[in-house]
Structures are given as structure tokens and as C-alpha cells.
Design a protein with these regions (language model features):
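Bacterial N-terminal signal peptides
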Residues: 9-19
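Alpha-helical segment that forms one wall of the substrate-binding/catalytic cleft
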Residues: 62-103, 107-115, 130-132
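A charged, solvent-exposed segment within the mature domains of Sec-exported extracytoplasmic proteins
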Residues: 114-139
């Protein structure tokens, strides 16, 4: 069965927004679990500027047409976080980089160019998120 790339991209974007796991290079990354780990690592309250995921105004504006105040609303912020992570995975694949939880956490903390510059260095933020992702039981 032939699937047009024009149909495939919206389907993939929709899958990331509804919370389905994303598979890249044979590795499945559960974006909802990763977002929970990012929330835990950031340690901010939802009522704080940028919400629990600590969006900057610039990042929020790149990803959403909604007002920055919506970054403090959990459902909307998680939707935009899934979009950000999914777009990062796509960009990494285009750049020949195999996406991992550690690299996605590094990108969340440092931005894409920061991730590229630091991806071969130890980075406690990324290590902490990686450990939460694989070792924490979110019950």
C-alpha cells in the first residue's frame, strides 16, 4: 500500500500530540514519560512563569500561537512540549543523529545548538532526566 508523504507527516504529528510513543532508529521513546521526567527535573510549579516545563517566551512563541500565559496550563504545555520534542527528533534524524532520551533532555536544557556542542560531554541535567526516565516509577 502506498502512503503519500503529504498524508504521513500530519499522521506523525497527530500521533505525537495524542501521546503515542515515537519510534526512531528502532528505539521507542515515550514522549509523555519523558515530559514527566522533564517536569520533575525542572522542579518548578505550574503557576510559575513558563510553567513546570519552564518554557521561555521565545521558545513558546516558536511553537505556539497561544499566549505565553498558557505555558502554565499543564495540558497545553504538555501538548507544546510533545510538539517540541517531536520536531527535535525529526531534526536530529535529518542531521544524522540518533535521538535518545539523554540527547532530548540535553536539547531541552541547552537548545539544539547547545545540544550539538555538548553531546559528547557529561551533563548532569541530561543524566538526571535519563535516570528518571529509566529508573523512576511514576505511580
Amino acid at each position: 500500500m502506498f502512503t503519500s508523504p503529504r498524508l504521513l507527516v500530519p499522521l506523525l504529528l497527530a500521533s505525537c500530540w495524542v501521546g503515542w510513543p515515537v519510534t526512531s532508529h528502532g528505539t521507542t521513546i515515550d514522549l509523555d514519560r519523558l515530559i514527566r521526567c522533564l517536569e520533575a527535573r525542572e522542579g518548578a510549579r505550574w503557576a510559575s512563569p513558563g510553567g513546570a516545563l519552564q518554557f521561555t517566551k521565545a521558545t513558546w512563541s516558536e511553537l505556539s500561537s497561544d499566549p505565553y500565559l498558557r505555558a502554565s496550563q499543564p495540558d497545553k504545555a504538555r501538548q507544546i512540549a510533545r510538539k517540541a520534542l517531536f520536531l527535535t527528533i525529526q531534526r536530529m534524524e535529518r542531521d544524522g543523529i540518533r535521538p535518545t532520551v539523554w540527547l532530548l533532555a540535553l536539547r531541552w536544557n541547552c537548545g539544539y545548538s547547545g545540544m550539538l556542542a555538548r553531546r559528547l560531554e557529561p551533563w548532569s541535567y541530561a543524566e538526571n532526566v535519563h535516570n528518571l526516565y529509566y529508573d523512576n516509577d511514576f505511580r
